[in-house]
């Protein structure tokens, strides 16, 4: 089992954890429907950047 050589100080512990924070997801608003979706992803209505790119069950 691994055993640490020296105790890590609170400052070094904080520096080690400095990149662990979670970021909020990048959300975009579809201009045609006003729906919120993840950036670079198709909205639930099948629109991407103002154009219909996928047929949905509601369209059929």
Curated annotation (Swiss-Prot):
Keyword Ribonucleoprotein: yes
InterPro entries, per database record: Ribosomal_bL32 (IPR002677), Ribosomal_bL32_bact (IPR044957), Ribosomal_zn-bd (IPR011332)
Disordered as annotated region, ranges: 1-36
Pfam family, one: Ribosomal_L32p
Keywords: Ribonucleoprotein, Ribosomal protein
Listed GO CC annotations: large ribosomal subunit
One GO BP: translation
Molecular function (Gene Ontology), one example: structural constituent of ribosome
Biased composition (Basic residues): 9-19
Superkingdom of origin: Bacteria
Database matches in PANTHER family: 50S RIBOSOMAL PROTEIN L32 (PTHR35534), LARGE RIBOSOMAL SUBUNIT PROTEIN BL32 (PTHR35534:SF1)
Listed NCBIfam families: rpmF_bact (TIGR01031)
Family note: Belongs to the bacterial ribosomal protein bL32 family.
Protein's name according to its UniProt entry: Large ribosomal subunit protein bL32
Protein species of origin: Methylibium petroleiphilum (strain ATCC BAA-1232 / LMG 22953 / PM1)
């Amino acid at each position: 089992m691994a055993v640490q050589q020296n105790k890590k100080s609170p400052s070094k512990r904080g520096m080690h954890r400095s990149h662990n924070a979670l970021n909020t997801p990048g959300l975009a608003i579809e201009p045609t429907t006003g729906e919120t979706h993840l950036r670079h992803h198709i909205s639930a209505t099948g629109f991407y950047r103002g154009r219909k790119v996928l047929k949905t069950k509601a369209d059929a």
